[in-house]
Amino acid sequence: MIAVIPVRDGVAPAGADETICEASGQALLIGSRTAQALENLGQVAHQVWLVESTIDAAHVIAAVNHIGRSRESLILPASPDGRDLAPHLAHALGRNLYAGAISISDNKVSVSRHGGLSIADFSPDASFIATLQIGIRGVDSMSASPTITSVDIAPTSNTAQTSVISLAVMPPDASTMDLSEAPRIIGGGAGLESGERFVQLQNVATALDASMGVTRVITDRGWAEHERQIGTT
């Protein structure tokens, strides 16, 4: 298996390190300033390929073919880029897609179902595409430095014409992003005694470019959405 890690401006997504560990340290970093992103991932990687290109299925497939690993299963972190890229890869390669997996190996994929209330086990008989849930497995450190290879993908002349042009990629809004992907969380609980206090807390979180998290008692009172809940429940 190979972990495919989308990189934007030198930043790898949440869950990149776990996904690389799930792939036994083998990773293909694709995007912009991948070498910079590797600085924070080198301790979990064994073999790394760096691809400076746009992040799309065609370039990932070209890179995998270039390194001679076209028959490998590809796994991605279940980050926004990973969730977007995985189905495109599955469609282009004609492979099964296992989304939201909690454990991945060559012969068994366990996928969370029904909001985490059940687990479905699959036994793939061919190469597949999968996304690994963020924060589910932890990381394993490698003692040796990784082997790093830069992969140059030459542009092809038969690229399909399109009327859609990407002008820019805007960063996520910390106040609305999923808590599992938030780099910084400002939390509050029953000690804040009214809904107005949580409006203030949200304003503080926004000012600090952070996400607001609350305890279950607060969501039960209706002072914040259940998507903002933190803690073991």
How would you name each of these model-derived features?
Residues 1-233:
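N-terminal glycine-rich FAD/FM-binding segment characteristic of electron-transfer flavoproteins
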